[in-house]
From Swiss-Prot:
Record's protein name: Carboxypeptidase Y homolog A
EC number: 3.4.16.5
Keyword Protease: yes
Molecular function terms, GO-annotated: serine-type carboxypeptidase activity
Residues bearing carbohydrate: N215, N510
């Protein structure tokens, strides 16, 4: 069995989905292999991204020789996805409809000067919301809202689901949760990790006593479009474009529900959210006149600095991450041999930002450094065991969640407008890879964030795909004024009260890194009490400078 070079799951930059692939033979030149059946791949991409340079063509030829199966997979899948079938409900079906144009037309006077009450280009966005009857689904007894952000100009519709805090919603902070992928629904985070309930194999609701909404209100957002309950006739294929949508959603949501706009607001997420969150936070902070009280960001097992992080796949797979080796000495040496070329390709992507540099880097590096581990059948999200359910990204619960969310009564209760719900949309995953988004150096945004807000990077130590070694390494390699102080900071134990140690933390200035024991890619699922503990302590300002 051969594997694709990209397919993330649950938000991981993984190569987890098997595709039927064949190595091209015959008399074709290497570059001729990169064609979509019935159309020229090159002409399609040059129309969108500009003409390929001679240097770029040489790189593509090289990658085709080094990773022919991976390029063949690319060829087969470089086809624009079809729109997600959906049927928009009348505005009369919703309890609230907020027009972005109306919000944008609001002006206030400050120091004798008039300016917009809420900055940003909101005129093409609208927000729809409905109050969810807690008794209808039994997820939680708290106040809930669901709905869509509509980009009317581009036919994009982002689904969200809000749960009020179980504790003190008038004063508790608000958290936006984002799963990764790119292309995985944040409702998987709701039901598998940190939401108020989970779904069992009989599709029954099971209460989560360690839900993150114990002491915070939480918004779960399906983004980018065509993920989960979100849909569009067009698509988003890069993180920056997705950031504009998220800013509009939050601006209109807090306008409609001002009772939550004064509370502290935090963005949290995992995996490819390591790309999303720096960009989304930067977009929010770029608007001086805003109704979003952003106080911090949290990234769990994220992909943020690929140049640094990809250097730690071999150590993690070969017994240097705290768990037994998965690969033999020969395979480990082959990964060591592949790393310099991988890092040179990523560095070219970092410097040029061009799709012609970034896509070959993704194809080669994923094939060389993730592929060997994946072919063992070991779970890329948890090095401690095998992938038990490959049809559901190793976790049967993902299938239960999809089945539950596809029930007509559930979709009706939430106002969902799509014909079907999918936990992960691999077309989106490929779109982001094909647009060169995978290795964009968004970690370079983090120093600017640290000037204004605290940043927490946490990592379960059993994850392979976005492992703790790589996450620790990029936090220490990050160039910012507090780098020396952070790297010399004392590493302290993490424990619930006087209980058993569940991890280690290092913090200096506005920057904090946590290693969490016995947790894979999805920390709140594997260590629910520990994740609840560090979340509440973080929101309470324990590690803030």
């Amino acid at each position: 069995m051969r594997f694709s070079t990209s397919a993330l799951v649950l938000g991981a930059a993984s190569t987890a989905v098997a595709l039927d692939q064949q190595v091209l033979g015959g008399n074709e030149s290497p570059f001729d292999s990169i064609k979509v059946a019935g159309q020229e791949w090159l002409s399609t991409f040059e129309e969108k991204f500009g003409k390929m340079t001679t240097e770029a063509k040489a790189v593509w030829d090289e990658i085709t020789l080094l990773a022919p199966d991976a390029v063949e997979s690319f060829k087969k899948n470089a086809i624009p996805p079809k729109p997600k079938p959906a049927h928009r409900k009348s505005d009369k079906k919703w309890d609230h409809v907020v027009k972005g144009a109306d919000v944008q037309s609001m002006w206030v006077e400050k120091n004798g000067e008039k300016h917009r009450k809420i900055a940003g280009d909101l005129k093409n966005f609208n927000l729809r919301a409905k109050k969810v009857d807690p008794s209808a689904l039994g997820i939680d007894k708290v106040k809930q809202y669901s709905g869509y952000l509509d980009d009317e100009e581009n036919d994009k519709h982002l689904f969200y689901w809000f749960f009020e805090s179980r504790n003190d919603p008038k004063n508790d902070p608000v958290v936006l949760w984002l799963n990764g992928g790119p292309g995985c629904s944040s409702l998987t985070g709701l039901f598998m990790e940190l939401g108020p309930a989970s779904v069992d194999k009989k599709l029954k609701i099971v209460n989560n006593e360690w839900s993150w909404n114990n002491n915070a209100s939480v918004i779960f957002l399906d983004q980018p479009v065509n993920v989960g309950y979100s849909y569009s006739g067009s698509s988003v294929s890069n993180t920056v474009a997705a950031g504009k949508d998220v800013y509009a959603l939050l601006s209109l949501f807090f306008h409609q529900f001002p009772e939550y706009s004064k509370q502290d607001f935090h963005i949290a997420g995992e995996s490819y959210a390591g790309h999303y969150i720096p960009v989304f936070a930067s977009e929010i902070l770029s608007h001086e006149d805003r109704n979003i009280n952003l106080k911090s960001v949290l990234i769990g097992n994220g992909l943020t600095d690929g140049l640094t992080q990809y250097g730690y796949y071999r150590p993690m797979a070969c017994g240097e991450g705290g768990y037994p080796a998965v690969l033999d000495a020969g395979e480990c040496q082959a990964m060591d041999n592949a790393l310099p070329r991988c890092q040179s390709l990523i560095n070219n992507c970092y410097e040029s930002g061009s799709v012609w540099s970034c896509v070959p880097a993704s194809i080669y590096c994923n094939n060389a450094l993730i592929g060997p581990y994946q072919r063992t059948g070991q779970n890329v999200y948890d090095i401690r065991g095998k992938c038990e359910d490959s049809s559901n990204l190793c976790y049967s619960a993902l299938g239960w969640i999809s089945e539950y969310l596809n029930q007509d009564e559930v979709k009706e209760a939430l106002g969902a407008e799509v014909d079907s719900y999918d936990s992960c949309n691999f077309d989106i995953n490929r779109n982001f890879l094909f647009a060169g988004d995978w290795f964009q150096p968004f970690h370079r945004i983090v120093p600017k964030l640290l000037e204004k807000i605290p940043v927490l990077i946490y990592a379960g130590d059993a994850d392979y795909i976005c492992n703790w070694l790589g996450n620790r390494a990029w936090t220490e390699a990050l160039e910012w004024p507090g780098q020396k102080g952070f790297n010399k900071a004392e590493v302290k134990s993490l424990a619930v009260g006087k209980g058993k140690e569940y991890g280690k933390v290092k913090s200096s200035g506005n920057f904090t890194f946590m290693q969490l024991y016995g947790a894979g890619h999805m920390v709140p699922m594997d260590q629910p009490e520990a994740s609840s503990d560090f979340l509440n302590r973080w929101l309470g300002g324990e590690w803030v400078a």
